[in-house]
Curated annotation (Swiss-Prot):
Start and end residues of each Ig-like domain: 21-123
Keywords: Adaptive immunity, Cell membrane, Disulfide bond, Immunity, Immunoglobulin, Immunoglobulin domain, Membrane, Secreted, Signal
Compartments reported by the entry: Secreted; Cell membrane
Start and end residues of each stretch annotated as Framework-1: 20-44
Biological source species: Homo sapiens (Human)
Disulfide bonds: C41-C115
Complementarity-determining-2, as annotated region: 71-77
InterPro entries: Ig-like_dom, Ig-like_dom_sf, Ig-like_fold, Ig_sub, Ig_V-set, IgV_Light_Chain
Gene assigned in the entry: IGLV11-55
Name of the protein in its database record: Probable non-functional immunoglobulin lambda variable 11-55
Region (Complementarity-determining-1): 45-53
BP GO annotations: adaptive immune response; immune response
Key word Hydrolase present: no
């Protein structure tokens, strides 16, 4: 049986307080069912991914975006409602990139994925 590649579209969204970070994602990513997708979101050099709140959203055709993953650190991650445990996140400070990881890809994972960074404006 032939495996059909899944197409995962990546779109970026940015927010911030005083500085406006730029988030960069590739326009699309293809992966085979059962594989692990590693979706990157690279921050501009004026901010460090290490100490930032990263949010990931999933949007399927005809639906509103839904919170998929909140990720601050390895010990502070939270899946959105109904998101399977095969979803996780990681950060790579050397490349200033956050990653959304989806293991055991399934056809229902085909969607648009948005990353967002939140920087608290607390003084």
């Amino acid at each position: 049986m032939a495996l059909t590649p899944l197409l995962l579209l990546l779109l970026s969204h940015c927010t911030g307080s005083l500085s406006r970070p730029v988030l960069t994602q590739p326009p699309s990513l293809s992966a085979s069912p059962g594989a692990t997708a590693r979706l990157p979101c690279t921050l501009s050099s004026d901010l460090s991914v290490g100490g930032k709140n990263m949010f990931w959203y999933q949007q399927k055709l005809g639906s509103s975006p839904r919170l998929f993953l909140y990720h601050y650190s390895d010990s502070d991650k939270q899946l959105g409602p109904g998101v399977p445990s095969r979803v996780s996140g990681s950060k790579e400070t050397s490349s200033n990139t956050a990653f959304l990881l989806i293991s055991g890809l399934q056809p229902e994972d085909e969607a648009d994925y948005y990353c967002q960074v939140y920087e608290s404006s607390a003084n």
